[in-house]
From Swiss-Prot:
GO terms for biological process: ADP biosynthetic process; AMP metabolic process; ATP metabolic process; cellular response to hypoxia; GTP metabolic process; nucleoside triphosphate biosynthetic process; regulation of oxidative phosphorylation; ribonucleoside diphosphate biosynthetic process. Belongs to the adenylate kinase family. AK3 subfamily. AMP binds at residues 36, 41, 62-64, 89-92, 96, 170. This is Adenylate kinase 4, mitochondrial. The modification N6-acetyllysine is found at residues 175, 179, 186. It is an enzyme of class 2 (transferase). Its main location: mitochondrion.
Length: 223
């Protein structure tokens, strides 16, 4: 195992397969997969101060502002100073990236570039189990029973912003907000971009990249 703690971030638009790639990285390299969405749900559920602040925005259908999500994530990262980790969903904006700079230096930033039309198709086929955050896709990750969560058997829902008419606007917004973040990490020489439509084809390159930074915990690539 490398003596230096690995600090990595994964960027990508909604529907890019970030969650799947994160799971594989965590499984193969023993990194903690730290998801901003997961921490938001946990803090809202626990009625923490920052969770209550975030809830006020979410209930109004608003984006959680930079200062709230940054406070939440920096608190979580402070508690994990001794761990290798992979950040997913943070930083989303330049303000968030600059706040993260004050805590640590990043070793790797990977961004997934997926064609616009592919993302639109994927998102409109996406259904979720809100209590857990589990995501299903009717094409490549369908539930065992149509419309039902595999673990609990509870009904799945399609988010309003996953409906086709909302998807294009979300993708445009992501592109506008993410561009300066991507440029920042590119200028520092830590950005690695992966393009394609299938996670299984991108994965070997991601595996090789991480293998050069940290010793895999498994002897072969886990799919």
């Amino acid at each position: 195992m490398a003596s230096k703690l690995l600090r990595a971030v994964i960027l990508g638009p909604p529907g890019s397969g970030k969650g799947t790639v994160c799971q594989r990285i965590a499984q193969n390299f023993g990194l903690q997969h730290l998801s901003s969405g997961h921490f938001l749900r946990e803090n809202i559920k626990a009625n923490t101060e920052v969770g209550d602040m975030a809830k006020q925005y979410i209930e109004k259908g608003l984006l959680v502002p930079d200062h709230v999500i940054t406070r939440l994530m920096l608190l979580e990262l402070e508690n994990r100073r001794g761990e290798h980790w992979l950040l997913d969903g943070f930083p989303r904006t330049l303000v968030q990236a600059e706040a993260l700079d004050r805590l640590c230096d990043l070793d790797l930033v990977i961004t997934l570039n997926i064609p616009f039309e592919t993302l639109k198709d994927r998102l409109s086929r996406r259904w979720i189990h809100p209590p857990s955050g589990r995501v299903y896709n009717l094409d490549f990750n369908p539930p065992h029973v149509h419309g039902m969560d595999d673990v609990t058997g509870e009904p799945l829902v399609q988010q309003e912003d996953d409906k086709p008419e909302a998807v294009a606007a979300r993708l445009r917004q992501y592109k506008d907000v993410a561009k300066p973040v991507i440029e920042l990490y590119k200028s520092r020489g830590v950005l690695h971009q992966f393009s394609g439509t299938e996670t299984n084809k991108i994965w070997p390159y991601v595996y090789t990249l991480f293998s050069n930074k940290i010793t895999p915990v498994q002897s072969k690539e886990a799919y």
